[in-house]
Amino acid sequence: MTLSRDDAAQVAKVLSEALPYIRRFVGKTLVIKYGGNAMESEELKAGFARDVVLMKAVGINPVVVHGGGPQIGDLLKRLSIESHFIDGMRVTDAATMDVVEMVLGGQVNKDIVNLINRHGGSAIGLTGKDAELIRAKKLTVTRQTPEMTKPEIIDIGHVGEVTGVNVELLNMLVKGDFIPVIAPIGVGSNGESYNINADLVAGKVAEALKAEKLMLLTNIAGLMDKQGQVLTGLSTEQVNELIADGTIYGGMLPKIRCALEAVQGGVTSAHIIDGRVPNAVLLEIFTDSGVGTLISNRKRH
């Protein structure tokens, strides 16, 4: 393909802007939570795969954790298994857990691995059960109303929380030039399976690896102020203030708390990225403007 002079000039501009960032992140690990619209559009899926392969090619180490809620819901519906949610978490009985494992560990994980490999990468698919990659325990959910004298414990089945990460396995794969692609299924002390929120798995993996960045792909432009303007950079202190005054609320709270916990746990920065934008991951790390909100321990003005 022959580029016009204007196109060639644009490519040169992009590369010159990216070079300092590439130098800064060579040898660093970036954990990317892949989900939402970025997993649904064929164009965005291909763009994500190219982004990940390019990162690896320039010496950056991407680790991918993926979701798959809509795909799980689709198969449950086809099997006439009803879905129930409590506080945004899917109640996961034994039959639902079987479906979760089939969809996340089979269909979705292998599709992503295949896509990355078709674009020149060496991706390898894993669930948290492989070599006890993601150790977990049952998540306890409680609810209390003013009328109750003590909280009610709600059983939401095989829903778990992360208790440990097999860092040795991930480091071995990364050093072998593989791109790990992780399905968010954890394993308990007795070998039982747990369905875990993909954001939470990504955050814990990033903490365990002492990653440079945790990148959460979403279907929004980033965190916004009360006027609807994207907040491009925030400190953990500023994020807590936005939670306290109600600017950040509802469905974004678990994602933001995951990002905060990762940064407080040693990850250099967490990013809430607009996954609807083509090449969102590269734009966020290799350009001055980015496409989302960066959260770090550093105070920003």
From Swiss-Prot:
Keyword annotations for this protein? Amino-acid biosynthesis, Arginine biosynthesis, ATP-binding, Cytoplasm, Kinase, Nucleotide-binding, Transferase
Identify the main location: cytoplasm
One Pfam family linked to the record: AA_kinase
Q: What subcellular compartments does it reside in? A: Cytoplasm
Which InterPro entries does the UniProt entry name for this protein?
AceGlu_kinase-like_sf, AcgluKinase_fam, ArgB, Asp/Glu/Uridylate_kinase, Glu/AcGlu_kinase, NAGK-C
Which enzyme type, at the first EC level? transferase
**What biological processes does GO assign it?**
arginine biosynthetic process via ornithine; L-arginine biosynthetic process
What metabolic or biological pathway is this protein involved in?
Answer: Amino-acid biosynthesis; L-arginine biosynthesis; N(2)-acetyl-L-ornithine from L-glutamate: step 2/4
Residues noted as binding substrate in the record, renumbered to the chain: G68, G69, R90, N195
Q: Which GO terms describe its cellular component?
A: cytoplasm
UniProt site positions, description: Transition state stabilizer = K33, K255
EC annotation? Answer: 2.7.2.8
Classification via PANTHER family: N-ACETYLGLUTAMATE SYNTHASE, N-ACETYLGLUTAMATE SYNTHASE, MITOCHONDRIAL
Q: Which HAMAP family match?
A: ArgB (MF_00082)
UniProt-listed NCBIfam families: argB
Q: What is this protein called?
A: Acetylglutamate kinase
Q: Which organism is it from?
A: Pseudomonas paraeruginosa (strain DSM 24068 / PA7) (Pseudomonas aeruginosa (strain PA7))
The gene behind this protein is argB
